[in-house]
Design a protein with these regions (language model features):
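Enriched for short, Lys/Arg-rich terminal
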Residues: 2, 13, 62-92
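Short, cationic motifs built from Arg/Lys/His that form the positively charged side of catalytic pockets
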Residues: 50-51, 58, 78
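A short, surface-exposed loop/turn module that caps and links secondary-structure elements
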Residues: 28-53
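Arg/Lys-rich, positively charged N-terminal/basic patches that mediate binding to nucleic acids
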Residues: 1-25
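A generic beta-sheet turn/junction motif
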Residues: 54-56, 65
């Protein structure tokens, strides 16, 4: 089963190029093949979202199992990513 994604490497211009490449690779290799298996569920205000770890960086995403889609909410350094994801939720 293959999931589709809503993400391109240019979506995160503030990250160093090497980190963007590693995040893109993680999305293409892990999230597209099995986002439930590789991701850890989040709690609290981010309940319903999952995360995968790429070194000190995190990718926050949600999965639509019915449509086989992965929505990447945000990616960034672990110190700021969770707050950034919460602010993204406030805008929805």
């Amino acid at each position: 089963m293959v999931y589709s994604k809503n993400f391109t490497e240019i979506d995160f211009p503030n990250l160093p190029k090497t980190i963007r490449a590693r995040i893109t690779k993680a999305i293409n290799e892990r999230l597209i093949t099995d986002p439930i298996k590789f991701g850890k569920p989040l709690r609290g205000r981010l309940k319903g979202y999952r995360r995968i770890r790429v070194s000190d960086y995190r990718i926050i995403y949600t999965v639509n199992i019915v449509k086989y889609k992965v929505f990447v909410a945000t990616a960034g350094h672990r110190d700021t990513t969770y707050e950034k994801a919460k602010s993204t939720l406030n805008k929805l």
